[in-house]
């Protein structure tokens, strides 16, 4: 059925990053099921070729409620939903950094580092790792740690 020169590679679930999360600078967002607390199985995993930890962290990716283009509620699943949530968190941190006279002009690397500092981590898991990155994104904790509270 197959040609004799066809071979199958040994699959490795820890080498499944795709562009743009495989690049150095962009924030790589993995996915998790926020109800069960487990990793979203279709979430890409693994460090970059330059051994940069990716994903940076995980965000909700299963059963995410959103507003559809017709104004109706829709349910989304996938790391695109997780990335949208993380993008909203980045915008929130940018706004926070520039409000109330702070005038902090934060770049994407700084915002990513702020979010990483606030990640929730399971004490039984070693971080960073190729599945969870630095943990579960927690914007409130990130801002509290950044602000020194």
What are these regions, as identified by a protein language model?
Residues 2-24, 30-53, 66-77, 99-101, ...:
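Active-site-adjacent substrate-recognition loops and nearby beta-strands
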Residues 31, 61, 139:
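Residues immediately flanking
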Residues 33, 49, 81, 91, ...:
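Short, flexible micro-motifs
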Residues 62-127:
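Hydrolase catalytic cores
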Residues 127-149:
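C-terminal domain-closing interface element
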């Amino acid at each position: 059925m197959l040609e004799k020169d066809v071979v199958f590679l040994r699959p490795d679930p820890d080498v499944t990053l795709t562009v743009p999360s495989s690049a150095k600078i962009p924030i790589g967002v993995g996915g998790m099921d926020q109800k069960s607390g487990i990793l979203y199985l279709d979430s890409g995993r693994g460090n970059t070729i330059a051994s940069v930890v990716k994903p940076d962290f995980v965000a909700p990716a299963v059963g995410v409620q959103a507003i559809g283009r017709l104004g109706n509620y829709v349910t989304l699943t996938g790391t695109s939903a997780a990335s949208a949530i993380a993008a909203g968190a980045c915008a929130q941190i940018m706004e926070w950094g520039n409000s109330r006279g702070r005038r902090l002009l934060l770049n994407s690397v700084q915002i990513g580092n702020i979010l990483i500092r606030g990640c929730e981590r399971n004490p039984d898991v070693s971080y960073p790792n190729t599945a969870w990155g630095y943990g579960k994104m927690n914007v409130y904790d990130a801002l509290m740690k950044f602000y020194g509270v």
